[in-house]
Amino acid sequence: MKLTITEIQEILPHRYPFLLLDSVEEVIPGERVVAKKNVTVNEQVFQGHFPGNPVLPGVLIIESLAQAGAVALLSMPEFKGKTAYFGGLDKAKFRQKVTPGDTLILEVELLKVRASAGMGKGVAKVNGKKVAEAELTFMIG
């Protein structure tokens, strides 16, 4: 199932300027999600990272993956109305820079889901090429 930005805002508490997802292309609650982030030159971070050579910081790619994973978790009926907090990060790797004009495709597969936590593997791609990956842990509250 696809989600619009309005539907994403019904699931996640994040708002501008920190809601990093523009759309969810597919979500299977409790299993996986595919989301998009359109990287634009107007994003405030590019004023300082880096002037004349804008590059999306890796931490924002990881946060985008975490928000996508949170959608997969919080779409489950038992977690409706809850918040997913970042609980941990392992094996993060960055393979290519992300710049204005890129569209990040964010894929997260949930590997474990418990009553108060979840774990997943995330991959971020641009034009079909892997730009980042990480294992993510979520705490649900």
Swiss-Prot record:
Name the source organism: Enterococcus faecalis (strain ATCC 700802 / V583)
What the entry lists under HAMAP family is as follows: FabZ
**Lipid biosynthesis among the record's keywords?**
yes
Q: Which BP terms does GO give this entry?
A: fatty acid biosynthetic process; lipid A biosynthetic process
Q: Which gene encodes it?
A: fabZ2
Q: What family does the entry list?
A: Belongs to the thioester dehydratase family. FabZ subfamily.
Biological role stated in the UniProt entry: Involved in unsaturated fatty acids biosynthesis. Catalyzes the dehydration of short chain beta-hydroxyacyl-ACPs and long chain saturated and unsaturated beta-hydroxyacyl-ACPs.
Q: Which cysteines are joined by disulfide bonds?
A: none
Query: Which EC numbers does the record give?
Result: 4.2.1.59
Reaction(s) this enzyme catalyzes, per UniProt: a (3R)-hydroxyacyl-[ACP] = a (2E)-enoyl-[ACP] + H2O
Protein name per UniProt: 3-hydroxyacyl-[acyl-carrier-protein] dehydratase FabZ
Q: Name one Pfam family in it.
A: FabA
Q: Where is the active site?
A: H49
